[in-house]
Amino acid sequence: VHLSAKSTIHPFADSLNETVGEILVKGSNINPQAFLPTLPKARLNFDATTIPSFTDGVALEGSIDLENDQAGFADENHIPVKRILGEFIIDDKGTVKIEDIGVGLLKDGSIDVSGSIDTAQDQLKLALGINNTGADDFVRQNIAGRLNGSIDVKGETSSPVVNWNLDSGFARTDGMLFFQTDKQLGQRTLKLDKVRLVPQNGGELNAKGSLELFKDRKLQLDIVSKAFNPARIDPQLPQGSVNGNINLTGILAQEKFAGKMQFAPSTLNGVPLSGKADVAYENKHLSRALTDLTLGSNIVKTNGSFGKKGDRLNIDITAPDLSRFGFGLGGLL
């Protein structure tokens, strides 16, 4: 590990602007995990340059050039960033202005960041450009498609509003999430609003919901499917035109969940899909399991409960053609 700083001071300069010259900070072979074992592993080398400036409302100009020689997947406790390169300005009011900072990710993806963070007013306004970014830029799991588009983050630093518009080439998604804050009680709720997933020629999914980030952590999620074709998202998923809705509620702190599903006339793998389900679960107890699903000649029906003494769960399955469910299934049951 090596860390050094260098600057030049001119104590007899004519102006404050000229008293402190360029400040150079260099670091090499820095591994966060060496300082705290729970931190991710990396080998960081960086050059940071700052130039004090006391004219035109600017207090500090700077740049950062950081490289990570041991970039790796986040799910292996590495940092999935290869390089960060860009410039910034801090004005005399404490506002940080970011000018096109580029973030090189693990594989082929990159993120461009610009905007401002106003520390005095507790406000931020950031624009992120997403370029050719895939799941393999972050984790080991490989998910089809690479994203291009934009993410905008603005509002209070503790409760920002996030809008996105992203396209994978065969599907696009847009939507908004924000944090609703009760400042008196110090409680925050995460809200999902107008979330859409739209495959090319594959219908769409719409979702909205909320998650309380305090006490019992109450959850509510509503999903509506309109002629949705799962195969347009991933070729390994079954072809179809799915219409229906899912309503999920829960209390995470109590491991308590309830869900309802209703299919309107739909198709999956070339045969009709219909039915409904009503399920309730609490702390390892399936208290309600009402399902009545039909996929072609396959029928699945359940009713009852499971998990406690005296419970009885009735299951009636007729599945002469398992291939209709996809996922490589075949035969009969």
PLM segments and residue spans:
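Interface amphipathic segments
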Residues: 1-333
